[in-house]
From Swiss-Prot:
One of its GO terms (molecular function) is inulinase activity. This is Extracellular exo-inulinase inuE. InterPro entries: ConA-like_dom_sf (IPR013320), Glyco_hydro_32 (IPR001362), Glyco_hydro_32_AS (IPR018053), Glyco_hydro_32_C (IPR013189), Glyco_hydro_32_N (IPR013148), Glyco_hydro_beta-prop_sf (IPR023296). Glycans are attached at residues 49, 67, 112, 300, 363, 398, 430, 531. It is found in: Secreted. The active site is at residue 41. Its EC number is 3.2.1.80. Residues 1-19 form the signal peptide.
Length: 537
């Protein structure tokens, strides 16, 4: 018998309220976070009938990981979000949980290949990992072992509000492929999409501890055939999870390439502790992903990092958008300390949605990201602060009081004599508390320094400095766009080829900023600061 998750019941269990105050300390004002409780990976990202759906790993019963369900939020512009009732509630929640709903994805089955559609209604189909904490015989008659991870599906006929699990045959991919069936406890995170050229559904899922991805195809989302494997390549310092596979335009033209993304935990970017996300560029023929030669490196630590900071993980892409409009969202936290960040009554936020494309930069096909929200509706038209300096002498100059939520556009010459140039953000009046975002000229690296960013007491690795490579542009200029919220900083460098994302937990009165040039003068400086208003109002 199928299991229907009714919105009214789930709503009561989840404690969803019609009116809520999003003004707590550290509450991001233009980053999505749940009203309360624990959140991690973004799941089931789907654009359908003018609505962006954001599902996410969620504990409806507390601020720590557990009872993992699929939370749900919707938006018409990737900016203003409305939290919805829990979509998939852990089976047995409130007593003995027998199945949790781990990460996955969702599609609109517009041709009703699954047969779930009725009365002309398009079925939305979610594919997720069923985690079984106890050995059991399932409604489908299948047996599973304790701690088994398998791939299952559910469908919705009301545009994602309520979901019916496919209990007659779940899980639809019960075990890892041979010869990896001993990995049944680490087989997870299906990303499913429609492949036009082959007219088939494709899903990529992780065999986590082996640093492998398994690729399957299907005609109907129910019956799956293994067609290839990918990996291990590049960074292998921790498990591989939360994979993605998608096509992007190259250099804004008609040429395209395919991209695989894979989360890694631990073993993230150099200088970080904990999780990160790497990517590969290549070709996909409907069954096999072949990486480009220059996207694979010798050894098992070098990688193409999607973000070089500590707080961008489990990045997932939207189904339902054209390839030129591709958008990804990442979890803005880190498994190293995620359970201990000082927020209440919620824990974790999502990073800014990012538009993805491929560009040839320094003769290499490179993933570029641009922050995508309805900026015209929340960002001030005129800057709060704007200055230009033909020469910015060694030392510092205070900027205006910037507040808690703003964007900084900063550019300067790469031929400067300085060793570093930076802006101190979310700083106290005496600058004993501050976060520094800037550039190291000799190393050609962006850096983000949160060692004095506020509360760093909850984890001994949190107070750190992070770096990401950025070669100056063809005019020998360095360009940074920096997005600051109440508890986060996201830096985008150049054309978006380098980003660094980090949480910070500053004092409420840390609203000051200043420019700092060390080791000499910085040339051709321009800085513009724009206010960003709350999306929760």
């Amino acid at each position: 018998m199928a299991r229907l998750l009714k919105a009214v019941t789930v709503c009561a269990l989840a404690g969803i309220a019609h009116a809520f105050n999003y003004d707590q300390p550290y509450r991001g004002q233009y980053h999505f976070s749940p009203q309360k409780n624990w959140m991690n990976d973004p799941n089931g990202l789907l654009y359908h009938n003018g609505t962006y759906h954001l599902f996410f790993q969620y504990n409806p019963g507390g601020i720590e990981w557990g009872n993992i369900s699929w939370g749900h939020a919707t938006s018409e512009d990737l900016t203003h979000w409305e939290e919805q009732p829990v979509a998939l509630l852990a089976r047995g929640y409130g007593s003995d949980v027998t199945e949790m709903y781990f990460s996955g994805s969702a599609v609109a089955d517009v041709n009703n290949t699954s047969g779930f559609g009725k009365d002309g209604k398009t079925p939305l189909v979610a594919m997720y990992t069923s985690y079984y904490p106890v050995a059991q015989t399932l409604p489908s008659g299948q047996t599973v072992q304790e701690d088994q991870q398998s791939q299952s599906i559910a469908y919705s006929l009301d545009d994602g509000l309520t979901w019916t699990t496919y209990d007659a045959a779940n899980p639809v991919i019960p075990n890892p492929p041979q010869p990896y069936q001993a990995q049944y406890q680490n087989f997870r995170d299906p990303f499913v999409f429609w492949h036009d050229e082959s007219q088939k559904w494709v899903v990529v899922t992780s065999i986590a501890e082996l640093h492998k991805l398994a690729i399957y195809t299907s005609d109907n989302l129910k019956d799956w055939k293994l067609v290839s494997e990918f990996g291990p390549y590049n960074a292998q310092g921790g498990v591989w999870e939360c994979p993605g596979l998608f096509k992007l335009p190259l250099d804004g033209g008609s040429s395209t390439k395919w991209v695989i993304t894979s989360g890694l935990n631990p073993g993230g970017p150099p200088g970080t502790v904990g999780s990160g996300t790497q990517y590969f560029v290549g070709e996909f023929d409907g069954t096999t992903f072949t990486p480009d030669a220059d996207t694979v490196y010798p050894g098992n630590s070098t990688a193409n990092w999607m973000d070089w900071g500590p707080d961008f993980y489990a990045a997932a892409g939207y189904n339902g958008l054209s390839i030129k409009d591709h958008v990804h969202i990442g979890w803005m936290n880190n498994w190293q300390y995620g359970a201990n960040i000082p927020t209440y009554p919620w824990r974790s936020a999502m990073a800014i949605p990012r538009h993805l494309a491929l560009k040839t930069i320094n003769n290499k096909t490179t993933l570029v990201q641009q922050p995508q929200e309805a900026w015209s509706s929340i960002s001030s038209k005129h800057p709060l602060y704007s200055r230009t300096y033909s020469t910015f002498s060694e030392g510092s100059t205070n900027a205006s009081t910037t507040g808690e939520t703003f964007r900084v556009d900063l550019s300067f010459s790469a031929t400067s004599k300085a060793s570093t140039f930076a802006i101190a953000l979310r700083a106290s009046a005496n600058f004993t508390e501050q976060t520094l975002a800037g550039y190291d000229f000799a190393k050609q690296q962006i850096f983000l320094d949160r060692t004095k960013s506020g509360d760093v007491s909850f984890d001994n690795t949190f107070a750190s400095v992070y770096h990401g490579p950025l070669v100056p542009d063809s005019t020998s200029m360095v360009r940074l766009s920096i997005f600051v919220d109440r508890s986060s900083v996201e830096v985008f460098g150049g054309q978006g080829e380098t980003s660094l994302t980090a949480q910070i937990f500053p004092s409420n009165d840390a609203v000051h900023a200043r420019l700092v040039s060390t080791g000499g003068a910085t040339e051709d400086v321009r800085v513009d600061v724009h206010n960003i208003t709350s999306t929760w109002n």
